[in-house]
Amino acid sequence: SLGQPFAGVYSTYLIPNNHPDFERRVEDLENAVRLVWSSIYTDSSKAYFNAIDSMIEEEKMAVIIQEVIGNEYNGKYYPNISGVAQSFNFYPFSYIKPEDGFAVIALGLGAYVVGGEKTHRFCPRYPKLQLASIQDMARDSQKHFYAIDMTYSEYNLVPDGEQATIKSYDLKTIEQDGNLQHCASIFDYMNDRIGFDFSVRGPRSVNFPDILQYDYIPLASSLDILLNIFSQAMGAPVEMEFAVNRENDEWIFYLLQIKPLIKNDYHMDIDNENIDFDKAILRADKGMGNGRL
């Protein structure tokens, strides 16, 4: 929608497509399409339509079928990295400008990212610039990830919903799959520092050091270029969802979705000379955000 964002309003179903009975696999796909289409009538969707003063009867929705990016590891299917990037950043810091954008990435399926869980945030133009301290990175790091459970084929999408085929796993599992290297570092409590020797015991901090600090793969520069191209093409700030997957020792970037970022601009002229600041409830010489309280 060009008028209002609808991301996350409707349902998304991921199916393993591995049942031995082909007819059952077709049935699962048909049920998933029906459930996505009917999700427009859920209480949460109706509440969103009421909030934006829109009518469900006027909605024209298409159901999209996409292949899930990833590989199978020991009965689990997931991509190495999932993320969301925006070309406008409402909360810049240091010398980062709002127009430099930002990205959030995590291990495993993108449901972890769009669900608002603990992700790693960075600016694609300045990926080495970090606001968090070493202790903050260890505390606020990703602790689990999502993958499609390929070992269970007798799921039921109707009663179990979007989580019918998705399971949460801890970081030890993804490390055993061989997919934590280049994506995490080890917090050394004794010396209060970050290390990269995975044979050392200690909490894993998912901060993608090799990728963002040492450009193991050009993820940050690729995002910076794409955000600039897409925002110019659309004539507005954009948001995109993406995945990065390692296939035969090659890292491949997948663009999953792109849409305009709805940003309302408010302009107000303020006469500072006639304002009694002694009576002001709140005053800030420097502020950031979307400009509204």
Report each predicted region and the residues it spans:
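Conserved mixed alpha/beta core segments that line enzyme active sites in large multi-domain catalysts
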Residues: 1-293
